[in-house]
């Protein structure tokens, strides 16, 4: 099922939670809505679900305008962060709930419901636990029950609101891998909300990066990490450093001095680069600063560097350096970005 969000604005007491947002979600796609608190990602998910109504704009399920359809009419599956399982029901009854409460005309026969529950128990690796109650399950198992319940009704779209937020790091990582396999097996169009970058980049076919009620960028994990299209995306996704620079005659200058890299255009801008995208150098045209700390991180080292700022608070950067590099605390270190992006100042 394709989903199209067209020109959606949502206001709460005149506060614009979303401002003219448009997004095309392909059938069978796994999409992550990623952003900090207050970015509008959960509001967008709730609008797709029908739990909120747009102030302006339309939401299409396929060719049908679903903007004012109820949750039931949209036939979406929704999984919450805190499971929302019925504690007095067994695992099997929780999974079957959405099928059992359907009107009699559309309710499957009991034998078909049992078959569907058995099939889903196998898919979520909970066969043998169907008679247990939620309190007898681990957090990861409960979340899989919640997902099976959402999928049991054969939803047009599956929506997940921070599905792993209540779980510890190890369980989250295991469930991420499992959810990707589950999605590939079922093929449901799936949208999930997260503030966890690693989760979004690992799981999603495409990531929708949001900030202050707007979409900043939509792309694959490679797109948003390697070619961010705004200062916000560059600074929000992964680790990065930034410095104010001037572009003159194709050369990038920092504090009036060339740093050995070139960029088209002219004028003032902000230079962004990632810790892993630098090379140490002895040449004059480079960035340089004093090493304040140096620590081991897996197969590399992270050097923290202070760069003088004309008597003001120094610029603080982190860069990766080779394990065999002679880096001493208090020493001067010279380096250049090997990959970077300069954004013009507005």
From Swiss-Prot:
InterPro entries in UniProt: AAA+_ATPase, ABC_SmlMolc_Importer, ABC_transporter-like_ATP-bd, ABC_transporter-like_CS, P-loop_NTPase, Sulph_transpt1, TOBE-like
Protein name stated in the entry: Sulfate/thiosulfate import ATP-binding protein CysA 1
Species assigned in the record: Agrobacterium fabrum (strain C58 / ATCC 33970) (Agrobacterium tumefaciens (strain C58))
Binding residues annotated for ATP, in chain numbering: 35-42
PROSITE patterns, sorted: ABC_TRANSPORTER_1, ABC_TRANSPORTER_2, CYSA
Entry keyword annotation includes Secreted: no
Keyword Nucleotide-binding assigned: yes
Topology class, membrane: Peripheral membrane protein
Gene this chain is encoded by: cysA1
Subcellular location: Cell inner membrane
One annotated GO molecular function: ABC-type thiosulfate transporter activity
Keywords: ATP-binding, Cell inner membrane, Cell membrane, Membrane, Nucleotide-binding, Sulfate transport, Translocase, Transport
Reaction catalyzed: sulfate(out) + ATP + H2O = sulfate(in) + ADP + phosphate + H(+); thiosulfate(out) + ATP + H2O = thiosulfate(in) + ADP + phosphate + H(+)
Assembly: The complex is composed of two ATP-binding proteins (CysA), two transmembrane proteins (CysT and CysW) and a solute-binding protein (CysP).
Family: Belongs to the ABC transporter superfamily. Sulfate/tungstate importer (TC 3.A.1.6) family.
Record EC number: 7.3.2.3
Residue stretches making up the ABC transporter domain: 3-237
Enzyme class: translocase
GO CC annotations, alphabetized: ATP-binding cassette (ABC) transporter complex
Job of this protein: Part of the ABC transporter complex CysAWTP involved in sulfate/thiosulfate import. Responsible for energy coupling to the transport system.
